[in-house]
């Protein structure tokens, strides 16, 4: 007897009618003691956790210093602890990250401080 390949078997099944395929499946279930019914993963669906993970670290990005450049420089200097020249250079190079990995509370406080002096800020 010649060995049948998977492709030969698939081609033979493709040429069969639907009724013949149903009978073939039934015969295979009987011969091998298996069931062709689909198993529904009900337990898996029930275990899915729908909680949203809230970000807890933010990078504060100065996108624009607006019209009050001097006030923004002072605020950046106060926030970062940098010198006047470094703060000025940082503000003038906007968009720039003012602080990395800040907590949510700290990031919101810095954002508020910068917006109060007219800067545009983004939390990432």
Curated annotation (Swiss-Prot):
The keyword 4Fe-4S does not apply. One of its GO terms (cellular component) is cytosolic large ribosomal subunit. Keywords: Ribonucleoprotein, Ribosomal protein. GO terms for molecular function: mRNA binding; structural constituent of ribosome. NCBIfam families: L12. Belongs to the bacterial ribosomal protein bL12 family. This is Large ribosomal subunit protein bL12. It comes from Vesicomyosocius okutanii subsp. Calyptogena okutanii (strain HA).
């Amino acid at each position: 007897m010649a060995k049948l390949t998977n492709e030969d078997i698939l081609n033979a099944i493709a040429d069969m009618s639907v009724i013949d395929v149903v009978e073939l499946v039934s015969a295979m279930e009987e011969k091998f003691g298996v069931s062709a019914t689909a198993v529904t993963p009900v337990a898996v669906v029930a275990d899915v956790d729908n909680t949203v993970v809230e970000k807890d670290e933010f990078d504060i990005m100065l996108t624009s210093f607006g019209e009050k450049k001097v006030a923004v420089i002072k605020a950046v200097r106060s926030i970062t602890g940098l010198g006047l020249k470094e703060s000025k250079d940082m503000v003038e190079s906007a968009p720039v990250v003012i602080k990395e990995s800040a907590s949510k509370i700290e990031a919101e406080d810095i954002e508020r401080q910068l917006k109060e002096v007219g800067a545009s800020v983004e939390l990432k």
